[in-house]
Curated annotation (Swiss-Prot):
Coiled coil: none annotated. Pfam families: UPF0223. This is UPF0223 protein BCG9842_B1176. It comes from Bacillus cereus (strain G9842). It comes from the Bacteria. Belongs to the UPF0223 family. Gene3D superfamilies: BH2638-like.
Amino acid sequence: MEYQYPLDYDWSNEEMVTIVKFYEAIEKAYEKGIIREELMGLYRRFKEIVPSKAEEKKIDKEFQEVSGYSIYRAIQRAKEVEEQKVVKI
């Protein structure tokens, strides 16, 4: 995809890499499918970096505007899927 991920320049380089991996996992959930544990593990790390619900919603909105993919919908779907199953939207 040719778009710029929403990033906060206050994040460290390591945190930015983690956030980009999370965005890529959301894309994968929409495009091919991703194992639930992989997605939820990246989401937990994302929440360590972005603990605020308001900030998470802001990032989700920005990400959805550039990619067309919803972080919220992907995570809700992952919570519905059994362990070791593929999350596909």
